[in-house]
Structure formats: structure tokens, C-alpha cells
Amino acid sequence: TVAGSPYTISAVLSPTGVLANYDITYNTANFTITPKLLTVTADAKSKIYGLPDPALTYVVTGLVPGDVVSGSLIRLPGENVGSYGITVGTLSAGSNYTITFVPADLTINKRAITIKADNNGKIIGDPDPALTYSITSGSLAYVDSISGALVRDAGEDIGDYPIRKGTLVINDGNGGLNYELTFVEGVFTIRQMLLTVTANPASKVYGAADPVFTY
């Protein structure tokens, strides 16, 4: 093994019967075992923002049969969308090897979410109700939240008005960049006012003119 190096090299002469004919000087030499080169190639990985990290795996080239690689890879810290380098971490094959590490990246991709404005409306002349929305696909991660307000196109005449995204934003500590946000507009409808007219009962004497009808 490398740890046991250097080893002493000595010579044995034969046949032993002829040694008396020589004046022999013994000079020793060292036999050194150098570490074997081992290539560890990290596998590229990816995940969606907010999900746990996948297992970090690798491919080994040059390992002697029976020997093992222990320890684990690590990646650079961070949970926002982007690429993070995978490093050798605690990987080791022992003192008999020198590791050449080929790095890779763990890529965090955006989290998809769909927000739809709820359809709403009012009677002409009334104040606008609060505009609301629903998450129809996907979800928020961690303690992320949504803030801001929807808006509708201006107008007070009878008809339909689009409800738009307005100032709605996702608070994720990264300017909302950790999400792939799809916004679906809603419809705000201004309707006619319903007017009920109730006629008052009336009567007359036969042959007389009709009275004035009231309501």
C-alpha cells in the first residue's frame, strides 16, 4: 500500500556455496508505491424550486476491484432558481488513490403556478366589490406569499370589463423569479339595475270613466 511505502529491496544470491569466494557489499534500495489516479465524475442533477434535493451521484473510473469509494458529494448552498456547483465533498478511496474530480451542477428550475382572477360584477351605480383570485394549478413553496391587488379596466357603463393582474406579485425573496407564473384574466360584468313596478288596485262604478292608475 501507499501508506506502507517505502519498502526495502534486498538481494539473495545462490548457490550459497559460492559466497565465500566473494567480498560482497550489500546496498539496499527503496521500492515506492505511488497513489493510483482515480477519476470521479459527478452526474448533473436538477430539481424544481421548493422540492428536496435529489441524491447526488457519480461515476468512478480506475478503481481496483474490491476497493470502495466512501463519503458523499455536496453542492454549493442556495435554494433560489439557478445553478449550484457539485463538489467532491467527503468522497475518499483511501490513501492508495489520488482523486481527479470532474464537477457538475445541480440546477434549480422555476416552479409553475397558475393564478386566475375570479369572475365578478355589480349592478350599475353600485361600488365595486373586492376583486379576488384563486390558485388553479401549482402551489407556493416554503413560506412564500402573494401580495398586491387585481385591477379591472375602467368604465361604469353596462358591459364586461377584463380583470387584470394589476400589482399582484409573489413574495419569494427573489423578486418572484423562482416561479413561472401564468395569470388568467377574469371578467367583471356591470349589469342593469332591476326595477320593480307594482300597480295599485283601482275600481270604478259601471258607466263611469276610468280612474287614474297609480303605482
What are these regions (language model features)?
Residues 1-215:
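Solvent-exposed beta-strand/loop surfaces, strongest in extracytoplasmic domains of secreted
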